[in-house]
């Protein structure tokens, strides 16, 4: 089967067919392009979906901890990888299918144009040969008619008796001329006819079959290319199936990793306050006064008894006690609320805390019907934190258990930072030793600012660790003695009809009012008085600052390079020395930043 022999006379049909083939190729390329756009949009939408539901972590505290959340975020990661595979499919189709189709379509157009031009040229050449043959034929026919006319004229004059011999001779010459020209045109026509027949045979049996064969091969290559692109279209999808299967397996593994018991334990770890549940309220017997009155038989005895009890209650007013959930309400405010339980001043301006029986009934109802008020203990700190407000730096606004965890996490982070700075200091010292031994490698003095900065960071981190460890010890100490305090409070209930709260606040008897000592400054706790020194510590030596120290942290003393200070307390092994300026300002400075000179008496001691 060959187009050259079977379709030798269908040039126009082959022209239309090859054009349709290229149009079909371009249409399929357009289909692939739209499929690529769909894959790209699908991948983009998947990535936007993952980005929308992924956690926006601004700190480590917001990292997911529950297994269900971690599993969901793992699924999002796998879905993000799946979106990446859809992008791979789009890229593969764009490179192997769409790009190849567009290049091949361009080549086909060029090749088709060339073959059709060759066919048209061959046809034009054959038409030219036919015109030459036709012209020679017409000329031969015309000369033959002229020769025939000349012969008739000669015969007519030759038979005419009146014609002269000259006329006959002239007609004979004309006949011979026309006959000669007819013979020449006959030979020309025969030659042109033979040439045309040869060219026509060559055209239909050699040239046209060759051109049509090339067109046929071109069209078959187009069909093969379409088949390859169909296969590449499917292969682009099939190549990513193993990776997509792994993504789906990862989602299944994430689903299997969900542990409900572990999540429940995390809830406990996250919200456990460390407080103990409130103890039982003691029975307060108010009827004993009535029974005493009846037994005495006089009303005056009851009055005297009540007077004695009132005098006893005034003695207890010297003890500072706090109500369980806040301040005692003012007498002129009938509706009780949690925020109106405190009375904070006396006529002379001193501040104190009072308590009456009405808040007891209110709090009993709150405990039974309202939501738990235990979180209100978070801000209690030795009975004064309700006035001072929460201290965020030491996490005192958190319950003991949560505060302990936060402090431990901070200490661990500070220890890691301290280890990093220590490693950097060691590396700088080694580099400094190398520079000192080999000056051509560098200037040892250039490392001094970096060493000073590193030492400053080390001292700062040590002080932070020391401060947080002190807070942690405070929390652990309170947690350790809470059971003993609870036991002692139960004994006090039996003796004084009172009750101690989990953080050291107290409730009072049924009809007694207990007032604490007046506070001159509401924003200062009793800790300030415990650490105030009446007399300044004596100087045991002096020191000179080798490096400057900024002293931004609380309790530190800023100093300039070369400044002379008094030593009032030696280094206890924590890297800090207590110093004082001449103006009396005191604070701690890094021991490694100063040159210490102690007096002989202090050295001997």
UniProtKB/Swiss-Prot annotation:
Residues 482-538 are annotated as: Disordered. Residues 66-258, 392-484 form a coiled coil. The record marks 165 as: Mediates end-to-end attachment of dimers. Its main location: cytoplasm. Residues 522-605 are annotated as: Interaction with DNM1. It holds the Pfam family SH3_1. Residues 541-605 are annotated as: Interaction with DAAM1, DIAPH1 and DIAPH2. It is a peripheral membrane protein. One of its GO terms (molecular function) is lipid binding. Residues 541-597 are annotated as: Interaction with DNM2 and WASL. GO terms for biological process: autophagy; cilium assembly; endocytosis; signal transduction. Residues 397-474 form the REM-1 domain. The keyword Coiled coil applies. InterPro entries: AH/BAR_dom_sf (IPR027267), F_BAR (IPR031160), FCH_dom (IPR001060), FNBP1L_F-BAR (IPR035494), FNBP1L_SH3 (IPR035493), HR1_rho-bd (IPR011072), SH3-like_dom_sf (IPR036028), SH3_domain (IPR001452). Residues 527-536 have a biased composition (Acidic residues). Belongs to the FNBP1 family. Homodimerizes, the dimers can polymerize end-to-end to form filamentous structures. Interacts with GTP-bound CDC42. Interacts with DAAM1, DIAPH1, DIAPH2, DNM1, DNM2 and WASL/N-WASP. Interacts with ATG3. Interacts (via SH3 domain) with ABI1, WASF2, CDC42 and WIPF1. This is Formin-binding protein 1-like. It comes from Mus musculus. The lineage of its organism: Eukaryota, Metazoa, Chordata, Craniata, Vertebrata. The gene is Fnbp1l.
